[in-house]
Swiss-Prot record:
Occurrences of domain Radical SAM core (ranges): 149-380
Segments forming domain MTTase N-terminal: 10-126
Residues where [4Fe-4S] cluster 1 binds: C19, C55, C89
Cofactor section: [4Fe-4S] cluster
A Pfam family that the UniProt record links to this protein: Radical_SAM
Cross-referenced HAMAP family: tRNA_metthiotr_MiaB (MF_01864)
Boundaries of every TRAM domain copy: 382-451
Region: Disordered, residue numbers: 465-496
Gene transcribed to yield this protein: miaB
GO terms for MF: 4 iron, 4 sulfur cluster binding; metal ion binding; N6-isopentenyladenosine methylthiotransferase activity
Main subcellular location of this protein, as a coarse class: cytoplasm
Protein name: tRNA-2-methylthio-N(6)-dimethylallyladenosine synthase
Length: 496
């Protein structure tokens, strides 16, 4: 702690780990800090305030946090006035131990009171002692807080927070609480305001997004919300994540198929293809229901790309159980999957289940699963060679774009496509480019032919306006990309 006085604006950096909810929460943390007078630390410069927005779903989340805190200890000791704050799910879980294991931490705050961060930082500075404040229920719905959006053309929009499911492997509901829903009018007002600012793609976000409406008793609230988004003038693309198979109903499928700006893309977490394992996981669906949902989605939207989450090595999983998962992967023909080796989390029912699977068995099954997922994804991508696709061009999409002199974007189905921009034509993030796919790989497509068409958009204008004036770096380091960027494996899945 330090009582050093500061005459210039204090700088900040937010480091984010985990799911999309954390990415969006970090946009709010950034907005709160800037609203309180902090400025983003320029690239390469040590920030006065470093905020960790943490994840608690997987075991390596703990190791990652405390490892990073350890690296900062000597930096803080040599930097008068520097402060470190830890928030998010791991802070909610480890509230009593963080300042014991890392006594140089100044502030610990939870998932329910992110709006308190600026006040807690100031209190820690003035009182010269650590401030630990964890609430057990939501203080203010996060959507009311100041937000600094990372993208000029795409945005997260929360429809709910919390989760009412009780999956035995997941600790998130105990950390984020029961589901609380925003009212449709409030959500649509935010969407319309974003579009007015130049956003043309939104992703509706919830721990169990299609359960939206349970709090106010409307079982079709989510499908109605999708259709209402279709009426927002200027909104090009609507996506959502993540649904739960148990509540995924035919009215949602119909709304997706019948609303032109709802994209033909679905992320539907499987977790396991074994009915026995699904029962042990307390997932309230079985293999037949899951495959039936996918069949109805593809009947309504033949070109839909479907991705999933799969956990390998859940306690009690036998070779036959695993083969059932492989069967579902073959039948479902996912365009991609986030695959995870089961991680025991203290405080979850699964942590105490008998028959924990040996690590070497889990590793073998994981490698076989990944190989199959990649094989199928590649086959599905090859079918798109020769097809024309309209891409929303995005910033920071391809790691090799600078070396290959390409740009990157996402198709309606959310597949990543790298393409060669035409000479003499400015194509900005947020603009729409139509290309013809010439090459397929398991995780991306390439369009090396001429660009068929470019449509300049209000989102491209917004991106250009944001980047016209010199500005410091965003101050946010994301464990996952911003909306519109490619989707590599996240640190952990959301509660789904």
């Amino acid at each position: 702690m330090s009582t050093a006085q500061h005459t210039s604006p204090r700088t900040y950096e937010v480091r984010t780990y985990g799911c999309q909810m954390n990415v969006h929460d970090s946009e709010r943390l950034t907005g709160l800090l800037e609203d309180a007078g902090y400025v983003a630390a320029p690239d390469g410069q040590q920030a006065d305030v470093v905020v960790f927005n943490t994840c608690a779903v997987r075991e390596n989340a703990d190791n990652k946090l405390y490892g990073n805190l350890g690296h900062l200890a000597p930096v803080k000791a040599a930097t008068p006035g520097m402060q470190i704050a830890v928030g998010g799910c791991l802070a909610q879980k480890d509230r009593d131990t963080i300042t014991t294991r890392a006594p140089w931490v100044d502030v610990v705050f939870g998932t329910h009171n992110i709006g308190s961060l600026p006040a807690l930082l100031e209190r820690a500075r003035v009182q010269d002692e650590a401030q630990v404040e964890i609430l057990e229920s939501l203080e203010v719905f996060p959507s009311t807080l100041p937000t600094r959006r990372e993208s000029a053309y795409a945005a997260w929009v929360s429809v709910s927070v919390g989760c009412n499911n009780t999956c035995t492997f997941c600790i998130v509901p105990s950390l984020r609480g029961k589901e609380k829903d925003r009212r449709p009018g409030e959500i649509l007002a935010e969407v319309e305001a974003l579009v007015a600012d130049g956003v043309s793609e939104i992703t509706l976000l919830g721990q169990n997004v299609n359960a939206y409406g349970v709090e106010f008793g409307d079982r079709q609230a989510f499908s109605k919300l999708l259709r209402a988004c279709g009426e927002v003038d200027g909104l090009e693309r609507v996506r959502f994540t993540s649904p739960h198979p148990a509540e995924f109903t035919d009215d949602v499928i119909a709304a997706m198929a019948e609303t032109p700006n709802v994209m033909p893309q679905l992320h539907m977490p499987l977790q396991s293809g074994s009915d026995k394992v699904l029962r042990d996981m307390r997932r309230s669906y079985r293999q037949r229901k899951f495959l039936g949902i996918l069949e109805r989605v593809r009947a309504a939207m033949p070109d839909a790309a479907i991705t999933t989450d799969i956990i390998v090595g859940f306690p009690g999983e036998t070779e036959e159980d695993f083969l059932q998962t492989m069967h579902v992967v073959r039948a479902a023909r996912f365009s991609g999957a986030f695959t995870f080796q089961y991680s025991k989390r203290p405080g979850t029912p699964a942590a105490t289940l008998p028959d924990q699977v040996p690590p070497e068995v889990v590793k073998d099954r994981y490698e076989r699963l990944v190989a199959l997922v990649n094989e199928i994804a590649w086959e599905e991508n090859k079918r798109l060679v020769g097809r024309r696709v309209e891409l929303m061009v995005a910033e920071g999409e391809g790691r090799k774009d600078a070396a290959t002199h390409r740009l990157s974007g996402r198709g309606p189905d959310n597949r990543l496509v790298h393409f060669a921009p035409p000479a003499g034509v400015e194509i900005r993030p947020g603009d729409l480019a139509t290309v013809e796919v010439t090459y397929a790989a398991p995780h991306h497509l390439v369009a090396d032919g001429p660009v068929v068409d470019v449509r300049r958009t209000r989102s491209g204008d917004a991106w250009a306006a944001r980047n016209a004036a010199p500005a410091p770096s965003s101050g946010v380091t994301l464990g996952m990309p911003t909306v519109g960027a490619p989707a590599p494996l996240p640190d952990a899945p959301a509660c789904r």
